[in-house]
Every structure is written in structure tokens, then in C-alpha cells.
């Protein structure tokens, strides 16, 4: 323990410190210790999909307390009225904590577009009816609208009019996240005959994948345009754009959002082979990336998904863009109160790979244990963050960052380096547009980044970046700039103390600007907590 005593009583975060100081990655792994406590703060954002299991105001309040940072609305399902109700509930739940600036947690709202996806029709009977497709059986896949609402085990309608043109005999059609696979035997004018390779129970309106086929659907469908406009009206904070295949698709989404929606962050979901191949141009055009492993695992072989995940996380970390890891992270918790060991490892490894956010889909939307799932992700993420080999990561990101004459970037790198040197308990950053906080986040400090801002949207969007803990300052700006800086720094200090990030006597690093306005962060101080 002597190592910690050298640091004085100031250092409260043991969080695998012994391992963090190792010289090599191997030595770092050897020193990891299951008895070392992680920090109070969690650096990774948690995104929860809101659905029937979680949309009541009371449930949402509990989700926020358990650690939800971003509420995701999936526009593949539900009407605008339904989503409007959910947005209202999320805001009401968030505002219920607003009376006290210390405990207030901004929660962002994300609109996930349906995108250019292909879906099956309705099974005849009710909306919840299912039919069994048996292995080896013949199934006719048709475009004939007469079957749109009465599919059964013999005929399946799909909504993609060019189906016949893009698939050949011998191709495969996957339905419902790849659970059901069909082999194309012959082609007709408006149908294909298939043989069921992998059967199962089939419900209504399930997703269809055609791996390898050159699907020519527009990047932004008519429904997407209506949904995005609705999102702008509702003032959502970010859009998760589905099935992005090239940079032009991102520009198309941006165009629909228009002038009024120019502050909305666009996160591109990479879900097929083309998206992976053209990753660099997509990343360049987007505000961030989501590794959508569900569809990706059907479009490319399942055993290659981890390669795509690591490549995308690596490139986003190098470029300083946020990246979200999604799909099946704690899938078994839809029905069980505890995750499988594999899922626990998966969440931890996404964090170790360098993901900024981790996401829950069915676990919180329709599962039996939505709160437990959020708490589980929170607990695993904290442990994994403590086990990061920060030193190597910082040096490598520094080596790869382009040398440009931007003072804020130099400040950020210097502040993070100083935070390692003095074992700072936190970095407090004043930020209007959020840029200063994002730059610091890029260098991945061990300590949380308390970002104090007066802009409520900046506060909500800050959750996309690893380590940024937004604090919304509601006090009116002070006439004297220096006084105003002190006022905000003190708010950051009070929040950090109240949340147990640090205590009196600990060192924190404070980043401020010496004149008002956005883009002038140029002063760094190392300050003991009063």
C-alpha cells in the first residue's frame, strides 16, 4: 500500500493504481487486483432504449437514478404520438431532479431512425400471432400486396420492391436478426421460392437481411424524413442514423435536419459490409459512430464482428470521435435478473476497447429487469475503466494526434498529462459549446471530467464523450468575468464533493478561459479542493 501513501491522503482512488503504473501491458495485466475498488464516477455513458417496460415517469426516474444518461427512442416501432408521450415523460422525470443543481442529471434524447430496412408483413390473425417455419419446408416470399397483412407458414410478404432484381438462386434471405434463414431455390416475376434452412417461430414485421446483395434503398426513406422533422420539432439531442453505407447518406440526414436541427448530433450506425469498408468517409462526415452489432453480425460473418468493433473503436479514438457499442450486451437480462458471464465480459471489453458509450436495447425497452440491467452495466463499466492501461493509451493518442496550432488542444493534452502526474481526482472544465470538454475526453484521463456549462443542450450531448460528467449552471452570469469563472468552478467543486468524486485537500485540475465566449480555453490551474 506504500504506493498510495506517497500520494498523501489526497488520493482516494485506489482504482487499480498499482496496475496503472506498470511499464508494459503484460505487467499491467499481471497487477490487476479484484480487491481494488473502482472510483465512484463512471466514465462511460449508458444509453437505454425506452419501451413499454420503461416509459412511465416513475420507472424513468429510477432509470436515471440507476445511471441512464441517454434515452433512445426506436422509430422502427410506434407512432409519433407514442414517441411524443415518451419524450414528455423523459423530460418530466429529468426535471424532477432539477430543483437542486448538485443532484441534477441532464438526460439526452436520441432518435433512432428506421432507415432503409426491409421488413416482413403481418402474420394473419392478430399483431402478436406467430407461425412456425419448419426446417426443409418450402416458403414463397412474395411482393404481392394481397399478402401484406396475411402471411402464414406458406407465404411471406416483404416490403422491398426490388427483391427479385438483387437476389439470385442460391442466395440467402435472413429474417428476424438472422434467426431464420431461407435459401432461394427459384425466381418468379414477383416472388421467389425458398427452402427454410433454419426454422423457428416467426412474428409480424420482422427485419430482413440480404447479405451480399446490392440493396438500392434510399439512405433516407419517406418515413425517415417525417421522423427526423418530428425530431427537430421535439428538440431531440441526437440522431442514430440506421444503415449508413457512405458519407453521402450522412449528408442526406443532415440536409433533412436543416438549419433548425443543425445542433443535433448525427451518430451513424454501421450495420453492413459496405459501411465497414467505407468507414473512414462515414466517420469524417458524422459526429460519432455506433457499432450496431445485431445487423452487422448477419451482414458479415459473426466471427468477424469483433474485428469490426475493435477497428471502429480504434479509429474513432484516434480521431477523437465518440463511439457507441450496441446490441445484445446484456441480452439474457431481458428474462433473467443476472447476465451470463459472456455478457459481463462483453460489456467490460467494449469499455476496455475504448467505447465512449454502451447501449441497452430490449433489456430496458421490453425486458423484465430494466433497472437491474442499467445497474449491471454501471457496475461493470466502473470496474473496466479502472483496469484501463491509461498510460499507454495517453501516449499513443498523443503520438497520433496531429500537431496543429489550436491552443485548446494543447491545453487538453497538457491538462491530462498533469492529471496523471499529480494524481488529480478530477478535471473541472468550463465549456460553452462542449468543445473544451470533448478535447480533454479524447486524451482519456483516469479522473472524471466535470464539465460546467450554461447551455442545457451542451450538457445533455456531453454524455456521448467518455469521462465527461456534465454540470448545468443555472445561475445568471456575473458581470465580472473572473467572478463568473469562480462561481462556475465552485459549482463544479460542490458537485464533485457531493458525489464523492473528491474531498477537501484533493487536487483537481481547472481549465478556464481568460475572456468570455466560446473557444478561448487557455488557462490551466492545479487547485486543492477547498
Swiss-Prot record:
GO terms for cellular component: cytoplasm; cytosol. Disulfide bonds: none annotated. Keywords: Allosteric enzyme, ATP-binding, Glycolysis, Kinase, Magnesium, Metal-binding, Nucleotide-binding, Phosphoprotein, Potassium, Pyruvate, Transferase. Pathway: Carbohydrate degradation; glycolysis; pyruvate from D-glyceraldehyde 3-phosphate: step 5/5. Its cofactor is Mg(2+); K(+). Substrate binds at residues 72, 269, 294-295, 327. Beta-D-fructose 1,6-bisphosphate binds at residues 431-436, 481, 488, 515-520. Glycolytic enzyme that catalyzes the transfer of a phosphoryl group from phosphoenolpyruvate (PEP) to ADP, generating ATP. This activity is regulated by glucose levels. This is Pyruvate kinase PKM. It comes from Gallus gallus. The lineage of its organism: Eukaryota, Metazoa, Chordata, Craniata, Vertebrata.
Amino acid at each position: 500500500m506504500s504506493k498510495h501513501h506517497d500520494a498523501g491522503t489526497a488520493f482516494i482512488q485506489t482504482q487499480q493504481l498499482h496496475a496503472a503504473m506498470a511499464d508494459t501491458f503484460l505487467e499491467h495485466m499481471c497487477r490487476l487486483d479484484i480487491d481494488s475498488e473502482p472510483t465512484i464516477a463512471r466514465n462511460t455513458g449508458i444509453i437505454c432504449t425506452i419501451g413499454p417496460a420503461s416509459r412511465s415517469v416513475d420507472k424513468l426516474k429510477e432509470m436515471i437514478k440507476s445511471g441512464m444518461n441517454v434515452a433512445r427512442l426506436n422509430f422502427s416501432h410506434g407512432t409519433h404520438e407514442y414517441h411524443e408521450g415518451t419524450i414528455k415523460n423523459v423530460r418530466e422525470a429529468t426535471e424532477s431532479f432539477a430543483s437542486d443543481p448538485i443532484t441534477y442529471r441532464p438526460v439526452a434524447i436520441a432518435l433512432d431512425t428506421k432507415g432503409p430496412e426491409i421488413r416482413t408483413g403481418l402474420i394473419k390473425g392478430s399483431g402478436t400471432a406467430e407461425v412456425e417455419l419448419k426446417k426443409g419446408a418450402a416458403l414463397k416470399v412474395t411482393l404481392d400486396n394481397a399478402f401484406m397483412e396475411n402471411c402464414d407458414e406458406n407465404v411471406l410478404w416483404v416490403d422491398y420492391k426490388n427483391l427479385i432484381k438483387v437476389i439470385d438462386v442460391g442466395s440467402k434471405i435472413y429474417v428476424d436478426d438472422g434467426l431464420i434463414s431461407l435459401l432461394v431455390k427459384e425466381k418468379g416475376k414477383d416472388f421467389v421460392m425458398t427452402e427454410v434452412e433454419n426454422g423457428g417461430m416467426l412474428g409480424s414485421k420482422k427485419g430482413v437481411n440480404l447479405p451480399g446483395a446490392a440493396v438500392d434503398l434510399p439512405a433516407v426513406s419517406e418515413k425517415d424524413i417525417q421522423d427526423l422533422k418530428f425530431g427537430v420539432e421535439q428538440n431531440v439531442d441526437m440522431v442514430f442514423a440506421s444503415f449508413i453505407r457512405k458519407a453521402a447518406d450522412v449528408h442526406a440526414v443532415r440536409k433533412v435536419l436543416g438549419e433548425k436541427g443543425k445542433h443535433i448530433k448525427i451518430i451513424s450506425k454501421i450495420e453492413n459490409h459496405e459501411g465497414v469498408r467505407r468507414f473512414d468517409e462515414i466517420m469524417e462526415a458524422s459526429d460519432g459512430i455506433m457499432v450496431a452489432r445485431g445487423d452487422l453480425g448477419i451482414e458479415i460473418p459473426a466471427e468477424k464482428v469483433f474485428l469490426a468493433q475493435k477497428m471502429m473503436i480504434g479509429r474513432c479514438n484516434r480521431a477523437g470521435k465518440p463511439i457507441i457499442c450496441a446490441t445484445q450486451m446484456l441480452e439474457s437480462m431481458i428474462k433473467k435478473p443476472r447476465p451470463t458471464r459472456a455478457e459481463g465480459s462483453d460489456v467490460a471489453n467494449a469499455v476496455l476497447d475504448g467505447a465512449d458509450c454502451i447501449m441497452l436495447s430490449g433489456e430496458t425497452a421490453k425486458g423484465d429487469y430494466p433497472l437491474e440491467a442499467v445497474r449491471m452495466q454501471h457496475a461493470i463499466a466502473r470496474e473496466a475503466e479502472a483496469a484501463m492501461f491509461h498510460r499507454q493509451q495517453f501516449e499513443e493518442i498523443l503520438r497520433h494526434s496531429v500537431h496543429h496550432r489550436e491552443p485548446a488542444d494543447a491545453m487538453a493534452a497538457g491538462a491530462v498529462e498533469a492529471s496523471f502526474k499529480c494524481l488529480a481526482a478530477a478535471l473541472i472544465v468550463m465549456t460553452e459549446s462542449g468543445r473544451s470538454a470533448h478535447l480533454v475526453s479524447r486524451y482519456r484521463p483516469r479522473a472524471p471530467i466535470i464539465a460546467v456549462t450554461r447551455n442545457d443542450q451542451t450538457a445533455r450531448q456531453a454524455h456521448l464523450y467518455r469521462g465527461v460528467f456534465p454540470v448545468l449552471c443555472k445561475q445568471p452570469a456575473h458581470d465580472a468575468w473572473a467572478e463568473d469563472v469562480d462561481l462556475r468552478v465552485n459549482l463544479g467543486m460542490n458537485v464533485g464533493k457531493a458525489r464523492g468524486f473528491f474531498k477537501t485537500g484533493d487536487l483537481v485540475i481547472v481549465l478556464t478561459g481568460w475572456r468570455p465566449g466560446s473557444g478561448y480555453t487557455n488557462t490551466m490551474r492545479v487547485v486543492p479542493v477547498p
